[in-house]
Amino acid sequence: KEEQMKTELSSLVSDKNVAKKYQKEYKELVEKIQDFDYEVKDEKVDGDAATVKVQITTYNFGTAYKEMYQQVVKDANSGKLTSKTDLNDYIYKMMFKKMNALKKKDYKKTVSIQCTKNEDGDWETDVDTNSDLKDAMLGGIMTLSSQNSTSSK
């Protein structure tokens, strides 16, 4: 699942050079994202299908993202950002600074994971396609980023 989380983070960091330029900060953020706790709250099994409710506890990346977004808007409106500002660099510096500064795991979200038994009798999950689970593991950042993109239209 480490590769999956790196892929999720990479989708947030779309510039190929960012991971290289901010290698230390990028690595720190990946490790922070992987540092989540979980607790199985409930499970319901019905033959070859099951639903497991899991509470994820992690860092509040969503709030850090929202604060970063608000700061970018404020700086743009105040004239701090000019045509000479490298916006990507400005945003990535702020993103890594805000997210890597998080110290407490105070974000909690309970999600449902769908499971099915395969022909070998092993359980498989929907974790690869479960956007609620990804959002929980990313501390609500997907929810808040979609709210920001909707509200800025």
Locate the predicted segments by residue.
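Core segments of small alpha/beta cavity-forming domains
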Residues: 1-39, 63
